[in-house]
Swiss-Prot record:
The keyword Transcription does not apply. It is found in: Secreted. One of its GO terms (biological process) is ovulation. This is Gonadotropin subunit beta-1.
Length: 127
């Protein structure tokens, strides 16, 4: 009986690990500052955040790549906000992504900053 329970746990472990991922939409605030415009605006949007199933092999072959999965945008739209106080001739708009859905997938370094999120600066800087 003990052997059967152990075998069942080992069989279900990968399935349960994948089921416990928590990649999904998260509400975030973004602060945008333009020195020439002399102002700072903060607005809310949605991004993708959470955990994805990943594993790291003990033996690594130089013939095989080992991509890790991250919580990435699946569907996205872009919205634009108006930057107040800008002099004429300046770009008065800031365009940003809004996540509609998320998925666990390999991070595309061509279009995404795949590094850790910088949480040290939470708003606009004062000079």
């Amino acid at each position: 009986m003990h052997l059967a329970v152990t075998a069942l746990c080992l069989t279900l472990a990968p399935v349960l690990a994948r089921a416990s991922t928590s990649c999904g939409l998260a509400n975030i605030s973004i602060s945008v500052e333009n020195e020439e415009c002399g102002g700072c605006i903060t607005f809310n949007t949605t991004a993708c955040a959470g955990l994805c199933f990943t594993q790291d092999s003990v033996y690594k072959s130089s013939l095989k790549s080992y991509p890790q999965q991250a919580c990435n945008f699946r569907d996205v739209v872009y919205e634009t906000v108006h930057l107040p106080g800008c002099p004429s001739g300046m770009d008065l708009h800031f365009t940003y992504p809004v996540a509609l859905s998320c998925e666990c997938s390999k991070c595309n370094t061509d279009s995404t900053d795949c590094g850790p999120l910088n949480t040290e600066v939470s708003g606009c800087l004062t000079h």
